[in-house]
């Protein structure tokens, strides 16, 4: 059994956490995030820490408390430091450029792909083959990165495609005659 829920989340300086019934709001230097807390979890804010206690008798309460603790910790880190995800384009002619709030991708198709960025996500292209996504919501950053990677996932024979910066692509050997 995981003990994630037993560890409290500390609130760093410059971050304000408010609880209104089952709605938790976290505000910081980078922005603010709001989340509705599950009814199986009681949240207590005291002495600069947030504690998560499962409701007695609720089914799966410890699991929900652990999940809630992890999500709230990501909210606190996001509004204080922010999150970033790097993508790499590997392949001849694969390019990315920023056009306003959209990313224009050339990935070997007969047409360029335009990926619209949702509110709360900013992108940067330090080079033609690199994309850096930044924001306060970890889930949203990961979702946008997965959508961009989904246009052309790395293939196992040559390794071409869109990959995460820290991703290891498992390579296969070509068939021999």
UniProtKB/Swiss-Prot annotation:
One cellular-component annotation, GO: cytosolic large ribosomal subunit
Pfam families cross-referenced by the UniProt entry: Ribosomal_L6 (PF00347)
A biological process from GO: cytoplasmic translation
Residue ranges, compositional bias (Basic and acidic residues): 152-171
Keywords: Ribonucleoprotein, Ribosomal protein, RNA-binding, rRNA-binding
InterPro entries for the chain: Ribosomal_uL6-like, Ribosomal_uL6-like_a/b-dom_sf, Ribosomal_uL6_a/b-dom, Ribosomal_uL6_bac-type, Ribosomal_uL6_CS
Gene Ontology MF annotations: rRNA binding; structural constituent of ribosome
Region (Disordered): 152-177
Family: Belongs to the universal ribosomal protein uL6 family.
Function: This protein binds to the 23S rRNA, and is important in its secondary structure. It is located near the subunit interface in the base of the L7/L12 stalk, and near the tRNA binding site of the peptidyltransferase center.
Complexes and interactors: Part of the 50S ribosomal subunit.
PANTHER family, A to Z: 60S/50S RIBOSOMAL PROTEIN L6/L9 (PTHR11655), LARGE RIBOSOMAL SUBUNIT PROTEIN UL6M (PTHR11655:SF14)
Protein name: Large ribosomal subunit protein uL6
Lineage, opening ranks: Bacteria, Pseudomonadati, Pseudomonadota, Gammaproteobacteria, Alteromonadales
Gene giving rise to this polypeptide: rplF
